Amino acid sequence: MATVTLTSCAGVDDNKIEDNPNIIFILADDLGYADISCLGQNKFSTPNIDKLASQGMVFTQHYSGSSVSAPSRSWLITGQHTGHTVIRGNKGLPVEGQHPMPSDTYTIFKMLKDNGYKTSVFGKWGLGAPQTEGAPENQSV
């Protein structure tokens, strides 16, 4: 499963943001260092990701905050150590399988919006089922 986070300063208050970059962050479960062609994969090509990489920044020293997905996502969007995030494990709950992240949790989405960005997420969320406080629309996404 992959999550793509898009942020844009298009259409925001020009007095608040000037020339801030657009951000595209791609998170893919089980994607290894050399699984895309711009980082050495030669058995198949990933031309669209390669083009994005050639026109922007590529970070190669990233690591997972946990061995399972929900705590890793929580760690990523809150900036908290996994011992401090509310979501500490993948739970076997119905629907999304997670306790919802509280709506008052300060996240990268809230920080970006506070600085004039528009944000969105596509793909797996895993931080709260629909109609809970952890749902993306209740997390400033």
Describe the function of each predicted region:
Residues 1-3, 7-141:
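Formylglycine-dependent sulfatase
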